[in-house]
A protein has these predicted regions:
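Extended amphipathic alpha-helical scaffolds
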Residues: 1-41, 234-248, 256, 263-264
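Glycine-rich, flexible beta-strand/loop modules in the N-terminal catalytic cores of phosphate-handling
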Residues: 10-95, 182-192, 196-201
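Conserved helix-loop functional segments at active or binding sites
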Residues: 30, 55-60, 80-93, 99, ...
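Conserved glycine-bearing catalytic or ligand-binding loops at nucleotide- and phosphate-handling centers
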Residues: 33-55, 61-64, 113, 191-221, ...
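Flexible hinge/switch segments at interdomain interfaces of large molecular machines
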Residues: 51-59, 90-94, 177-182, 193, ...
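Mobile "lid/hinge" segments at catalytic clefts and subdomain interfaces of large enzymes
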Residues: 122-227
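Single-stranded RNA-binding regions, centering on S1/OB-family and related RNA-binding modules
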Residues: 234, 238, 243-357
Length: 357
């Protein structure tokens, strides 16, 4: 096991077991990067995606590398299911998460190696997963493949961590993945009529021991997720504003929010209908700047607060002082001086600084 293999990736790891080796990478993005799926039942969103790549050179062959095939899509979905159960909620970790598995060498069980590799890459990226996920492929050899192994004269052997030949000539490929608390994904392919409860129980017991050894090997390299995301990953801050202030933040035709984005070096600002605002940017200073601008827009002056602002307009009856953002307050002419004042312009002018309550 090895982590931080690729320095510029948000998270990376390499997992090797025998003659199978997989490099896993994790990329973090804003929630607006979710994959939108438009199907017959309506639109759905995917916040976590796992892609599995099995190039021909991983098994010593030469071939074209085009669109993913059925096998690659299936293995990707299996890994996605195995890892999805330990991911933090969107509220806990408001990022879109994309994992890639690159099989660079394969002699069986590459789908389970991809689960182990990307479990480490998630922790390397600072994703606060709930536990270490490990996977193993179990096999079965019977002396009469035409019959179920429940016959007394049909002896069988259960194999742990099957190789390519054992997968090809064997009677079962049983993929098991999960944490120390339980299983998160199972997939069984069999070439015989079925398996008994005894065989299934024995296979799961052996798989549990093997997965525990793999978890220990992973924990020796990276025992828990990093406390912070990579410096190359987008930083973010989430906060709440009153729903009635959303229109002020967005502005007419999006003018206000677009101006903030330009002024903050392209910071991404997500505004939800419930008033939740999330700001993403690689530079923390730009995030702080965008948040301060939104705070100024949504802030309301309270009785008793003291402000020091610039005079923006002077009328006979008083002076208008900028309190914060685009909010001005009127300082009545009677408050400018203890004595009687006929005209505010005789006391202050535009550009002066006043401390007001």
């Amino acid at each position: 096991c090895q982590v931080d293999l690729l320095p510029r990736a948000h998270g990376s790891a390499m997992f090797t077991r025998g003659q199978t080796q997989v490099i896993g990478t994790t990329t973090l993005g804003p929630l607006s990067d979710k994959q939108i799926i438009d199907n017959l039942t309506g639109e759905t969103e995917r916040r976590f995606m796992h892609h599995y790549n099995f190039p021909p050179y991983s098994v010593g062959e030469i071939g074209r590398m085009g669109a993913p095939g059925r096998r690659e899509i299936g293995h990707g979905k299996l890994g996605e299911r195995a890892l999805s159960y330990v991911l933090p909620s969107e509220a806990e970790f408001p990022y879109t998460i994309l994992c890639f598995s690159y099989v660079v060498e394969s002699n069986g069980s590459s789908s389970q190696a991809s689960i182990c590799a990307n479990c480490m890459s998630l922790m390397s990226a600072g994703v606060p997963i709930k536990g270490i996920v490990s996977g193993i492929a179990m096999g079965l050899i019977t002396n009469d493949p035409s019959r179920s192994p429940d016959k007394k004269d049909n002896h069988y052997t259960i194999l742990t961590d099957i190789q390519g030949l054992e997968d090809h000539f064997g009677d079962m490929d049983f993929k098991c993945a999960g944490t120390e608390k339980g299983l998160t994904a199972l997939q069984m392919d069999i070439k015989i009529h079925g398996v008994t409860r005894e065989v299934l129980h024995e296979a799961l017991e052996q798989a549990n021991k093997a997965r525990a050894e793999i978890r220990a090997a992973i924990a020796a390299v990276i025992p828990e997720p990093r406390k912070e995301v990579s410096k190359y990953a987008p930083k973010m801050v989430t906060f709440q504003i009153p729903t009635e202030k959303i229109r002020d933040v967005i502005g007419k035709g999006g003018e206000t929010i677009q101006g903030m984005i330009r002024e903050c070096d392209g910071a991404e600002i997500d505004v939800e209908a419930d008033g939740t605002i999330t700001i993403y940017h690689h530079n923390q200073e730009m995030i702080d700047k965008a948040k301060a601008m939104i705070d100024d827009i949504t802030r309301e002056a309270k009785v008793g607060e003291i402000f020091e602002g610039e005079v923006t307009r002077v009328e006979d009856y008083g002076a208008f002082v900028n309190l914060f953002g685009d909010t001005d307050g009127l300082c009545h002419v009677s408050r400018l001086k203890w004595d009687y004042v006929d005209n505010a312009s005789s006391i202050v002018k535009v550009g002066d600084t006043l401390k007001v309550v």
